[in-house]
């Protein structure tokens, strides 16, 4: 199972250093199935027992792109895993860069956690699968370092996860399109994680607020 933590705009370098130290000690050995996405200002240079990923980046090595992170910056911290397509980035105008980001990350051999998800109106209109398929049309579903995270927008940050029957329907559909690992994200917590992980085709979870405290993240990993 893959356990990924998106820390979003939380943690400083000092606090994430403590987070990483505790997680490293608990794990004891390197595990590529544990991924943590800290904010970029908190990136750590030292080797960890988990994969450190980037929440955002610009599809360039470097250049005249004010305020952006290029490959050169990720390389400095040994980062080879990126999050692409999160709804909070799409809402900020990231939609037009998604294909360029994917293509760049693939070209450079990055592990990619690619997020897809529908809003409540799309769900209620019965067009979820059609919508998700369209979101996936711009990427290579056979890329060997791809992970797809299904995060229904109506569940992100609301404390209310999607119904397991809805999750199962979506993951079964996605499994018919690709053989890459499939994650669920959206208000994952200690009360629902076991049920979510028991859904057929679920290969793990992308966790938000429930992973902000390292002790909670460890508890979710251990089950």
Swiss-Prot record:
Pfam families, per database record: TIM
Residues annotated to bind substrate: 6-8, 157, 187
Catalytic activity of the protein: D-glyceraldehyde 3-phosphate = dihydroxyacetone phosphate
Domain of life: Bacteria
Keywords: Cytoplasm, Gluconeogenesis, Glycolysis, Isomerase
Metabolic or biological pathway: Carbohydrate biosynthesis; gluconeogenesis; Carbohydrate degradation; glycolysis; D-glyceraldehyde 3-phosphate from glycerone phosphate: step 1/1
EC code: 5.3.1.1
GO molecular function: triose-phosphate isomerase activity
Record has Cell wall biogenesis/degradation as a keyword: no
Annotated disulfide bonds: none
One GO term (biological process): gluconeogenesis
InterPro entries: Aldolase_TIM, TIM_sf, TrioseP_Isoase_bac/euk, Triosephosphate_isomerase, Triosephosphate_isomerase_AS
Record flagged with keyword rRNA processing: no
Subcellular location(s) per record: Cytoplasm
Subunit (UniProt): Homodimer.
Protein role: Involved in the gluconeogenesis. Catalyzes stereospecifically the conversion of dihydroxyacetone phosphate (DHAP) to D-glyceraldehyde-3-phosphate (G3P).
Family that this chain belongs to: Belongs to the triosephosphate isomerase family.
The protein, known as: Triosephosphate isomerase
């Amino acid at each position: 199972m893959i356990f990924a933590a998106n820390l979003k705009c939380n943690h400083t370098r000092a606090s994430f250093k403590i987070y990483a130290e505790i997680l490293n000690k608990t794990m004891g050995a390197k595990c590529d199935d544990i991924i943590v996405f800290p904010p970029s200002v908190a990136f750590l240079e030292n080797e960890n027992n988990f994969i450190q990923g980037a929440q955002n980046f610009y599809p360039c090595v470097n250049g005249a792109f004010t305020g952006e992170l290029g490959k050169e910056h990720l390389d400095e911290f040994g980062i080879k895993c990126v999050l692409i397509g999160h709804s909070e980035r799409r809402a900020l105008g990231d939609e037009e860069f998604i294909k360029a980001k994917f293509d760049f990350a693939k070209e450079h051999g990055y592990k990619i956690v690619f997020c897809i998800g529908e809003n409540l109106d799309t769900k209620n209109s019965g067009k979820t699968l059609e919508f998700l398929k369209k979101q996936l049309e711009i990427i290579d579903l056979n890329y060997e370092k791809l992970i797809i995270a299904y995060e229904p927008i109506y569940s992100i940050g609301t404390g209310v996860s999607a119904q397991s029957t809805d999750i199962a329907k979506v993951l079964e559909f996605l499994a018919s399109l690709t053989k890459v690992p499939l994650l669920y994200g959206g208000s994952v917590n200690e009360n629902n994680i076991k049920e979510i992980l028991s859904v057929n085709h679920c290969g793990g979870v992308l966790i938000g607020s429930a992973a902000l405290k390292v002790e909670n993240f460890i508890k979710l990993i251990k089950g």
